Swiss-Prot record:
Keywords: ATP-binding, Kinase, Magnesium, Metal-binding, Nucleotide-binding, Thiamine biosynthesis, Transferase. Pfam families: HK (PF02110). It comes from Desulfotalea psychrophila (strain LSv54 / DSM 12343). Belongs to the Thz kinase family. This is Hydroxyethylthiazole kinase. GO terms for biological process: thiamine biosynthetic process; thiamine diphosphate biosynthetic process. Signal peptide: none annotated. One of its GO terms (molecular function) is ATP binding. It comes from the Bacteria. Substrate binds at M47, G196. The keyword Magnesium applies.
């Protein structure tokens, strides 16, 4: 097995043993499912978005996960307050720019968070990620309209520009810091048919980042774990409804050894310009 496969197994074992607290400021649509995904993974979720407590709450957390799915000005303020405290504490921040590129408010809010806080990982689909750069992409709501392969070169440049890790999910996931690129081939076709799978994947990245401070490695192994769980769930599911339940079971039941054997991760060099 490759070193990254072994790291994936070790990261999962660390999550199960340490149960890191993951502070989520996330959207109403996915709060319940995201919390259950984190619990099934082995982490401890907390959903806290009130400005009165976010700075205090993030001090207990192993990572901070920000999701702009159901956005308002007050939530942006909460995210910025929590982010600044997280930066002071050197706590990793994971951003999910849901629907960035679809509306000016979403795009501006995502860019503001990136500008005012040091974000460790940005996880989104290709269109969302590319909307954060100078080239505008064609975002249809929260669905991807650009392939991961089409986004690879731009993502590498954008990762270096923003000095962050970009995790672009699709049929094949791409994770890059602008210098190294990992492709993750785990996943299942039913995953896009369940609301919250992408947002939950972001939260799982937060769990892995809480135990592995090499955030490129953490994001890559997190997506492999989540994708492999999707494959396991797909074998038992008959449609999106049963898949959602089986995914929780697969996350909970997967052993580190199964992850080491089942993850499909390839590394390549980032394209330079």
């Amino acid at each position: 097995m490759s070193n990254i496969s072994l790291t994936a197994a070790e990261n999962l074992q660390q999550i199960r043993e340490n149960k890191p607290l993951i502070h989520n400021i996330t959207n109403f649509v996915v709060m319940n499912y995201t919390a259950n995904v984190l619990l099934a993974t082995g982490a401890s979720p907390v959903m806290a978005h009130a400005q009165n407590e976010v700075e205090e709450m993030v001090a207990f957390a192993g990572s901070l996960v920000l999701n702009i799915g159901t956005l308002s000005e007050s939530w942006v303020s909460s995210m910025l307050m929590a982010s600044q405290r997280a930066n002071t504490l050197k706590t990793p921040i994971i951003l999910d720019p849901v629907g960035s590129g679809a509306t000016a408010f979403r795009t501006a809010s995502a860019k503001r968070i990136i500008a005012e806080a040091k974000v460790s990982v940005i996880r989104g689909n290709a269109s969302e990620i590319l909307s954060l750069g100078s080239e505008q992409s064609n975002t249809r709501g929260v669905d991807t309209s650009q392939s991961v392969s089409d986004a690879a070169q731009t993502a590498s440049l954008l990762a270096r520009e923003l000095d962050t890790i970009l995790a672009i999910t699709g049929p094949t996931d791409l994770v890059t810091d602008g210098r190294r690129v990992f492709n993750v081939d785990n996943g299942h076709p039913l995953m896009p048919y369940v609301t919250g799978t992408g947002c939950s994947a972001t939260a799982v990245v937060g769990a892995f980042a809480a135990v592995d401070r090499d955030y490129l490695r953490a994001a890559t192994t997190a997506l492999a774990f989540f994708g492999l769980a999707g494959e396991m769930a797909g074998k038992a599911a008959t449609g999106p409804g049963s898949f959602m339940i089986h995914l929780l079971d697969a996350l909970y039941n997967m052993s580190p050894e199964q992850l080491e054997k089942g993850c499909r991760i390839k590394e390549s060099s980032a394209t330079r310009s």
